[in-house]
Amino acid sequence: MHVDIVPVGEVSAQVKREASDGLRSVYDCEVSMHEPQSIPAGAYDGDRDQYRAEEFIDLARRVGSGGKNIAITPKDLFYRRRNYVFGLAYLGGSGSVISTYRLQTSSDGGFSNRSAGEIFSQRVRKEVVHEVGHTLGLEHCDNKRCVMNFSPTVRQVDVKEVSLCGSCQRNVL
């Protein structure tokens, strides 16, 4: 499998590296880094002061060179009536997106003794692996430690591992 990472907007080298490393370690796949892209026209919703996640998925699918493609952006994303999303993917689709905007809170609430930088890096890895998992046909998992567990808050992201549980692993690999 080949996953193409599509940076959209200003994405740091650290975020690109963490995303790439996370995908390689969990899915043992080939990962490439696409040329940076501009924010998609029409993605911004002025009433919400946020960006439509679907527009980033469409961009990743359109310009990405992989069988699976994931956009990464620092912009604050939303989907339909949800206040925000960390990421979005369509089950079995070729495009997905994560936003680092809400992953950058300074601490994990005392869950671990890691630095803010380490916590952020782990969140990026988890969300990239989670969204690409959806494109591979994985649905949300009830196992709170599994990377495919639904995590609407950063606290819940922090609880899960950067790996698939046995059940999800059997379903995808």
UniProtKB/Swiss-Prot annotation:
Pfam families: Peptidase_M54
Keyword field contains DNA-binding: no
MF term (GO), any: metallopeptidase activity
Needed cofactors: Zn(2+)
Annotated binding of Zn(2+) 1, by residue: 130, 134, 140
Keyword Zinc appears in the UniProt entry: yes
Active site residues according to the UniProt entry: 131
Keywords (A to Z) from UniProt: Hydrolase, Metal-binding, Metalloprotease, Protease, Zinc
SS bonds (residue pairs): none
Domain of life: Archaea
EC number: 3.4.-.-
Binding residues annotated for Zn(2+) 2, in chain numbering: 141, 146, 165, 168
Signal sequence bounds: none
Cofactor binding annotation: Binds 2 Zn(2+) ions per subunit. One is catalytic, whereas the other seems to have a structural role.
A Gene Ontology BP annotation from the UniProt entry: proteolysis
Function (record text): Probable zinc metalloprotease whose natural substrate is unknown.
Self-association state and partner proteins as the record states: Monomer.
Family membership: Belongs to the peptidase M54 family.
Protein name (Swiss-Prot/TrEMBL): Archaemetzincin
Annotated organism of origin: Haloarcula marismortui (strain ATCC 43049 / DSM 3752 / JCM 8966 / VKM B-1809) (Halobacterium marismortui)
Gene: amzA
